[in-house]
């Protein structure tokens, strides 16, 4: 399969076609069973996190190390010139791009990753989350996990629960799964946190079935994937947060009518939207999902930075 991802910016999952998604998934599966410790030897990658992160940052950095590359960067944007001296993001990226072979960026501003790509002088940009907009590498690991557990990415019933308005992971995942045939979407959220119109409009245009629901119980017997999200305190005012956070909590009792193949996913961190007892059910898959992030990020890093792959 031709590697059309070589030197490509990974900004939005919508920028990748279905063949490119399949290429990443194939490479992820390969790297999960066969280590490639020298694949990116002598490459230097910048990890630029202007917004707090645990799993995404450490997963990316682990992926970089396991491929044999070196990593530089920061995990707190307030301690660099952009934060302390007022340097623009474009200037920061222009300078960093002269040091490295790729830049991983997380930034609270929507559109920041695409802006960074305009000033990176051809150095590939990997979007690790830009505000409430996109989180493409999370989507790649989500797709990898879904395919591992369901053996397909089509003909699935997918429920997304919680903060669908600000949750960038559900935006990206819906766009990706919309590329595959006969998927149906069940959106469960408070009225104030429904899926953005641009996602709903995209599904309408593709003639993909979707519907809003008020609770998980009414759909649990119909779904293959239950994608839970936390209500994001950092993106809501205190009144809205208090109203929404406790409305959508998954208990083991909710799962009594679940399909045998159901898998529960979550981008993490979990707060209180999944009861701890759910962890011990055969449906809980969120920690395995998080572990898959290393392989998916290894895959996309290697495909963007190395043109030819032999396996």
Curated annotation (Swiss-Prot):
L-aspartate binds at residues 85, 168, 230. This is Aspartate carbamoyltransferase catalytic subunit. It catalyses: carbamoyl phosphate + L-aspartate = N-carbamoyl-L-aspartate + phosphate + H(+). Catalyzes the condensation of carbamoyl phosphate and aspartate to form carbamoyl aspartate and inorganic phosphate, the committed step in the de novo pyrimidine nucleotide biosynthesis pathway. Transmembrane segments: none annotated. Heterododecamer (2C3:3R2) of six catalytic PyrB chains organized as two trimers (C3), and six regulatory PyrI chains organized as three dimers (R2). Carbamoyl phosphate binds at residues 55-56, 106, 135, 138, 268-269.
